[in-house]
Amino acid sequence: MTQLDLIRNFSIVAHIDHGKSTLADRLIQLTGTVAERDMKAQILDSMEIERERGITIKANTVRIEYPAKDGKTYVLNLIDTPGHVDFAYEVSRSMRAVEGSLLVVDASQGVEAQTLANVYQALDAGHEIVPVLNKIDLPAAEPDRVRTQIEDVIGLDASDAVLISAKSGLGIPDVLEAIVTRLPPPKGNREAPLKAMLVDSWYDAYLGVVVMIRVMDGVIRKGDRVKMMQTGAVYGIDRLAVLKPQMVDIAELGPGEIGVLTASIKQVRDTRVGDTITHEKKGCEAPLPGFKPAQPVVFCGLFPVDANDFEGLREAIEKLALNDASFTYEMETSAALGFGFRCGFLGLLHLEVVRDRLEREYDLDLITTAPSVVYQIYMRDGTVQELHNPTDMPDLTLVDHIEEPRIRATIMVPDEYLGDVLKLCQDRRGIQLDLSYAGSRAMVVYDLPLNEVVFDFYDRLKSVTKGYASFDYQITGYREDFLVKMSILVNDEPVDALSMMVHRDRADLRGRAMVEKLKELIPRHMFKIPIQAAIGGRVIARETISAMRKDVTAKCYGGDATRKRKLLDKQKAGKKKMRQFGKVEIPQQAFINALKMDS
């Protein structure tokens, strides 16, 4: 059991690539928490995809013991949080589990959009924040400019920011001293009833579900019977441990301490991030504030390229869902793509990560249908429906109005690209809320429909700014707009996988782009194929793939025109019949490319 004044709990806040995981590696290395031979880069990022993309997806923790200059040995608990907006709720829970943050900013790049979003979360959680300027050994580093930027944009005093290079290890001892001297110790009462926050949980093949907790009040011991306050489920604790980053067993955890427990829990869904854990008997009265279940925001269909892989996909998705409570799925059938799943995600990065993990860890080839968001449909009879899939759109005569989710987007961009960014946001039905400057960078705040962002907004933003813009968003709520369902018909047959919800003003443009793209992708057949984009019964765009034609008059010599006419009429009648009964083969690649549309 550690004294409260010798504990420091902290997280590291940074934009992607500003050196957060490298700094964590150095802190672990310098304090000898992990033996040199076991040390590897990004030691806290356990998933292969986290290493490869250089991002942190799950919150990870490590307990470091540090003998400080004042002669005392402190216990430092670092929670390494995800920096990406899709995992914002995980970040907010992790922030509530600690008392302070290190704000890591790249001395050559300055403050970025995600830095801002995460700093505001840290400030909301009441954190003490220590600014750290990383990569000061780079030729392009400008510590003084970045210091003023931190003061102007965030409003933090950065005069005593710690200067480091996480890569070479320069300045790391100063960071450890700053954690001990400038961050506050946790508060808590040993004698009070147990109150612990569930920070994260993951599935382990041998142990079942492993739950990471932060004890606020009271003491938790091995063998205790504990209750989850949101679900009401009761479990007996099999094992208590701290992570160094490997599990090290411990007898009890007291106030201010962070550790993990296992209790024969079968599914991650039974453990909800942000829930309060207390004793079954003589537990605490009220749970910790701020709990909310994760809500999927973006939906799309996942189908196997080879129909025989469906069972493999089902198993893979079930295993992934064990480890990811925010990922939802249900079975779906599509006339064009066969059997698959309709899956819900927290955002686009979450979608990409899940798809990459399915393809890589389970060796599957997948087709992803166009991502869609959740619409609220207000019916004439006063009921409200949630629409996850455009193909389930009810008859328009029964619909009063449709509301779509809106977001507040913050974009940081060098001012020479500002015009292009403003144009992109206006094209996507954005409403400008704010524009401010910090040095040579502009910060734009826009209100945008999420539907316009999930498609390819991020890619377009990166291309118009040569990769210099950074982007972050929060969902603000729902608003009514003039939305319609656009169907694509090939040879007069609707193709369900290609239908989408669009704004009426952009439908013509979107429809024309889609039919032109399909015209290039679908191979020619022996008969003429019309491709149409339609809203209800009205066709808004059409292209025709001409038929392949055999020269039936080649064997006619001489000048008898009636003979040629007869042969041509016979061919024409055959083509007509063929079109009536013929099926159009749409290759899988055509679906994949059509869904990668850039409009």
Swiss-Prot record:
Q: Which domain of life is it from?
A: Bacteria
CDD domains to which the protein is assigned, alphabetical: EF4_II, EF4_III, LepA, lepA_C
Reaction equation(s) it catalyzes: GTP + H2O = GDP + phosphate + H(+)
Give yes or no: UniProt keyword Lipid metabolism.
Answer: no
Membrane topology of the entry: Peripheral membrane protein
Which residues are noted in the entry as GTP-binding?
17-22, 134-137
Where is it found, in Gene Ontology cellular component terms?
plasma membrane
| Record Gene3D superfamilies | 3.30.70.240, Elongation factor 4, C-terminal domain, Elongation Factor G (Translational Gtpase), domain 3, P-loop containing nucleotide triphosphate hydrolases, Translation factors
Q: Name one GO biological process term.
A: positive regulation of translation
State the UniProt keywords alphabetically: Cell inner membrane, Cell membrane, GTP-binding, Hydrolase, Membrane, Nucleotide-binding, Protein biosynthesis
List locations, semicolon-separated: Cell inner membrane
| Keyword Disulfide bond belongs to the record | no
Q: What is its EC number?
A: 3.6.5.n1
Q: Which residues form the tr-type G domain?
A: 5-187
Q: Which NCBIfam families match?
A: lepA, small_GTP
Protein role: Required for accurate and efficient protein synthesis under certain stress conditions. May act as a fidelity factor of the translation reaction, by catalyzing a one-codon backward translocation of tRNAs on improperly translocated ribosomes. Back-translocation proceeds from a post-translocation (POST) complex to a pre-translocation (PRE) complex, thus giving elongation factor G a second chance to translocate the tRNAs correctly. Binds to ribosomes in a GTP-dependent manner.
Q: What's this protein's name?
A: Elongation factor 4
Q: Which organism is it from?
A: Cereibacter sphaeroides (strain ATCC 17025 / ATH 2.4.3) (Rhodobacter sphaeroides)
What lineage is this protein's organism placed in?
A: Bacteria, Pseudomonadati, Pseudomonadota, Alphaproteobacteria, Rhodobacterales
Q: Which gene encodes it?
A: lepA
